[in-house]
Amino acid sequence: MAGTSLVAGDVVVDALPYFDQGYDAQGVREAAAALVEEETRRYRPTKNYLSYLPTPDYSAFETEIMRNEFERLSSRQPLELLSMKRYELPAPLSGQRNDITAWQECVNNSMAQLEHQAVRIENLELMSQHGCNAWKVYNENLLHMIDCAQKDLQKLRKKIQDLNWQRKNSQLTAGARLREMESTWVSLVSKNYEIERAIVQMENEVYQLKERSGENKENIEDY
């Protein structure tokens, strides 16, 4: 918008994009790009503009697991497969068939897996009883969040539209005022030109009258 607003302390913002014409004319965009390129070449930074900042620590948020994984990737080692041993029920080895400790470990493993399956069954029962309602409540919360977000979005869009309308009306008003002032300026310049031409013409007439008066005076003196 035209006015006295300053950018960077010295630049007067006088663009009226809703009023000005000619931006789509051939060569205008290329000329603007050339001016920008010239400005960037003229003020290209001569040093690292981040030199005043401390050296970044990229490992600040790394965990032990992440570091081990990065080391594995850097050394090109294959990914360790997921162990399925906990889901198996192996019997004692042939050489340990008479070892009570080996059989006890197998029994403990079986009990742990049975307990795990029992917990899974309980979770499935809870899911069958309360899962539908919980899912409905979750969906209702999502719909409420979406509705609130949509309302906020509509408010923002309305604010943006109102602001654009205000800018457009202000710029069109300023543009009409500028056009009126330009027309007045052209009219005043034309009038000044007419006045100057009339003055020059009158000066010439006065000069001619003086010359005639002088000639008449000489003729009278001759008589």
From Swiss-Prot:
Main location class: nucleus
Keyword terms of this UniProt record: Coiled coil, mRNA processing, mRNA splicing, Nucleus, Spliceosome
Protein localization: Nucleus
Coiled coil: 139-223
Domain of life assignment: Eukaryota
GO cellular component terms given for this protein: nucleus; U2-type catalytic step 2 spliceosome
TM ranges: none
Keyword Coiled coil carried by entry: yes
The protein's role, per its UniProt record: Required for pre-mRNA splicing as component of the activated spliceosome. May have a scaffolding role in the spliceosome assembly as it contacts all other components of the core complex.
Name this polypeptide is given: Pre-mRNA-splicing factor SPF27
Organism: Xenopus tropicalis (Western clawed frog)
